[in-house]
Amino acid sequence: MSKFEKEQIAFPNDFRRNYISDQLHQKYDHKTNTELIHLNVKVSVAGRIMTRRIMGKSSFMTLRDGGGCIQLYFTIHDMKSQTMYFKVIKTWDIGDLIGVKGVLFKTRTGELSIHCKEMVLLTKSLRSLPDKFHGLRNIETKYRQRYLDLIVNEESMKTFKIRSLIISEIRRFMHQHHFIEVETPMMHHIPGGALARPFVTYHNKLNMNMYLRIAPELYLKKLIIGGFEKIFEINRNFRNESISPYHNPEFTMMEIYEAYVDYNNMIIFVQELFRTLTERILRKSVIEYGDYSLDFEKPFIKMSIKEAIMYYLPDIRTKNIDDILVVFDILKFFKVPSDNQWTLEKLHMVLFEEIVSKKIIQPTCITHYPIEVSPLARCSNDNAKIADRFELFIAGHEIGNGFSELNDPDDQRNRFLKQATEKMINNDIDQDESNMPYDKDYIVALEYGLPPTAGVGIGIDRLVMLLTNKHNIRDVILFPTLRSK
């Protein structure tokens, strides 16, 4: 590097470009070489050298910038001196960042290229890039050094550009439907809003433990109480739990709340959102995900947990799954652990989650979740043991969870107290830390009146996986959580 410092400013910052590569391709790809010569299009571009072909007194390079790639051509006669030409071909390497000025032309094969008249080294790459054609063979390096993955893997860059577009389109859709975007705290006094183990931190000034949020739900419903009627938030949640191809401890979630609707209205709204996203992002409503074709044009399938069990497990259709002993036997057959204290409704849910859910391919809303595992959801008018709740499953995985909100402060207080009691008497750490604590402040807020409301949470990372055909959540998170080296 000292050699370059002596010969020029080591890291110049005075080069300015007037195009990026995709703008040139969009504007001039259809032109013939004769037309380009007549137009005499002068361009300034900057980017990273991705390939080099040295051919004696003339050379080619591929330059990659934020818009894509474009070919560069230069000869010994284009340089200020022969010394400059040989300096370029001998000391400029793949990975270096350069700026060039020149005119557009087309090669004999019809490729749009820049005939370079001026070239300047902007930043020297002091480390060799991975082989562009083989990429990063070490998967951990791909995630740990994402910048390298983005440099050599155009598919990764495309994925994260699509992710950004998806979030932009979600916001556009929400604003078109008159929802207001809000922000709620990332650090909570108590962990609430979902059943999950939190990350704990400590506030030195306040001399107290705080918790990275596991869900923003209670704060968002306080805003509905305050008078907002249609709100959403896109932000991070943190759960101190497992890491898997579908789980990252830090993940992006969108939560939506609307007053004066119920969970059935929310199903229709989510269906419209997903159909709009597939059409605007992928220009089609039937998309490919692995070996599956997922149809977002049709209304979402809707079935209860019991209906899903009977549909996806045809071998047990002759069995009476309203008999709790029969369900225990079915779980035992599938080697699914169970507890003899569980209710029939919870046994159904466990059987569904462990065996049935992975069989659901087309967008399907599963309903009739037990109230005992839905502490913030309203009870069904038809069955007090069942919540007005749905979960959206696509390609074998949960993508969203929504329900009609519980707005009875006495009922909510009793549910909080019941879980707090279970927390005190339960010696299992995992279960202990996943029980929802008693949130006195939320009960006070409910006593001022929460209108009939429905809400839904949608996992943005899993949604991006669907729309980019990725099967590991780490492929759609720029810097996923990894073990320290």
Swiss-Prot record:
UniProt keyword annotation of Ligase present: yes
Residues annotated as binding Mg(2+) 1: E391, E398
Alphabetically ordered keywords of this record: Aminoacyl-tRNA synthetase, ATP-binding, Cytoplasm, Ligase, Magnesium, Metal-binding, Nucleotide-binding, Protein biosynthesis
GO terms for MF: ATP binding; lysine-tRNA ligase activity; magnesium ion binding; tRNA binding
Cofactor: binding comment: Binds 3 Mg(2+) ions per subunit.
Coiled coil: none
GO biological process, one term: lysyl-tRNA aminoacylation
Subcellular location: Cytoplasm
E.C. number(s) listed in UniProt: 6.1.1.6
Major place of residence: cytoplasm
Cofactor annotation: Mg(2+)
One Pfam assignment: tRNA_anti-codon
EC main group: ligase
Family: Belongs to the class-II aminoacyl-tRNA synthetase family.
Assembly behavior: Homodimer.
Protein name: Lysine--tRNA ligase
Species of provenance: Blochmanniella floridana
Origin organism lineage: Bacteria, Pseudomonadati, Pseudomonadota, Gammaproteobacteria, Enterobacterales
Gene: lysS
